[in-house]
UniProtKB/Swiss-Prot annotation:
It comes from Homo sapiens. As part of the Ragulator complex it is involved in amino acid sensing and activation of mTORC1, a signaling complex promoting cell growth in response to growth factors, energy levels, and amino acids. Activated by amino acids through a mechanism involving the lysosomal V-ATPase, the Ragulator plays a dual role for the small GTPases Rag (RagA/RRAGA, RagB/RRAGB, RagC/RRAGC and/or RagD/RRAGD): it (1) acts as a guanine nucleotide exchange factor (GEF), activating the small GTPases Rag and (2) mediates recruitment of Rag GTPases to the lysosome membrane. The keyword Repressor does not apply. The modification Phosphoserine is found at S67. Keywords: Acetylation, Lysosome, Phosphoprotein. Signal peptide: none annotated. InterPro entries: LAMTOR4. Its main location: other. The keyword Acetylation applies. Belongs to the LAMTOR4 family. This is Ragulator complex protein LAMTOR4. One of its GO terms (biological process) is protein localization to lysosome. The modification N-acetylthreonine is found at T2.
């Protein structure tokens, strides 16, 4: 069952799973990230650390999106209000570039 909270996440191409967090608690999850409390904790800590960086004075939120790229997948993190949306996406293979 798709809720208003997750309907957009389920339509993301190459999506392998998602987490929706609020204050470190998992509100919704699916796929590879379903009920993954360890990932939720690590991502919450990462977001907290990233929020500590202030490149420009006066910014309310220091970032909107954060990408953590691994070999075969990427974690895409978006902060919206009090919620953190995390999507695990499959990285698409690329053809080698001839130089």
């Amino acid at each position: 069952m798709t809720s208003a909270l997750t309907q957009g996440l389920e339509r993301i191409p190459d999506q392998l799973g998602y987490l929706v967090l609020s204050e470190g608690a998992v509100l919704a999850s699916s796929g590879d990230l379903e009920n993954d409390e360890q990932a939720a904790s690590a991502i919450s800590e990462l977001v907290s650390t990233a929020c500590g960086f202030r490149l420009h004075r006066g910014m309310n939120v220091p970032f909107k999106r954060l990408s953590v790229v691994f070999g075969e997948h990427t974690l895409l993190v978006t902060v919206s209000g009090q919620r953190v949306f995390v999507v695990k996406r499959q990285n698409r293979g690329r053809e080698p570039i001839d130089v």
